[in-house]
């Protein structure tokens, strides 16, 4: 008779020990770069707006955008800027401390007037509250004013 009670007690303890713990979020955020279009063309001194839609299944934590010159790519240098051109690199960051699952990133970008002509890489990264990270990549060309396609 005691064995029935012990069995019932053990079964109850077993069921209580099974918690409803939420599973760990392993889903990476998603990024859709809306602008500039991949392989866009700009001139040194131009400005444009970086637009990207960030989303996560639970909560976004932060974002980062980086632009850097691709020194190995094809470039068009004009003789008047060859000595003064700089390999352009810039970075922007933002914290999303709330519990946002969606965020429209809108970041104005100004290309320096003395930016090196050639291909630049654009990297947009998103991090969620659990530490999952993802990145989206695109490129654009900084051209000389007199460049023709």
Question: Where do the PLM segments sit?
Answer:
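C-terminal motif of bacterial Sec signal peptides marking the signal peptidase cleavage site
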Residues: 14-17
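Proline/serine/threonine-rich low-complexity linkers at boundaries of modular beta-sandwich domains
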Residues: 19-32, 148
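Extracellular acidic, Ser/Thr/Pro-rich low-complexity tracts
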Residues: 40, 49-59, 69-71, 128
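Exposed beta-strand face motif in extracellular beta-rich ectodomains
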Residues: 48, 118-122
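Aromatic sugar-binding surface patches on proteins
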Residues: 88-108
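Surface-exposed, short loops/turns at beta-strand junctions within beta-sandwich domains
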Residues: 99, 113-118
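Extracellular and select intracellular beta-sandwich modules with Ser/Thr-enriched
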Residues: 120, 133-138
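Conserved structural position at the C-terminal beta-strand
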Residues: 124-126
């Amino acid at each position: 008779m005691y064995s029935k009670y012990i069995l019932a007690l053990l079964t109850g303890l077993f069921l209580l020990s099974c918690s409803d713990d939420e599973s760990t979020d392993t889903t990476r955020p998603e990024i859709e770069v809306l602008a500039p279009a991949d392989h866009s063309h700009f001139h040194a001194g131009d400005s444009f707006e970086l637009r990207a839609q960030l989303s996560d299944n639970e909560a976004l934590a932060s974002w980062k955008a980086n632009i850097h010159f691709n020194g190995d790519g094809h470039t068009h240098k004009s003789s008047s800027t060859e000595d003064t051109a700089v390999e352009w690199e810039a970075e922007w960051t933002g914290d999303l401390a709330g519990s946002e699952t969606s965020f429209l990133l809108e970041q104005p970008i100004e290309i320096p007037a003395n930016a090196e002509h050639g291909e630049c890489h654009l990297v947009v990264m998103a991090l969620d509250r659990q530490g999952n990270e993802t990145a989206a990549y695109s490129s654009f060309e900084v051209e000389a004013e007199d460049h023709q396609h």
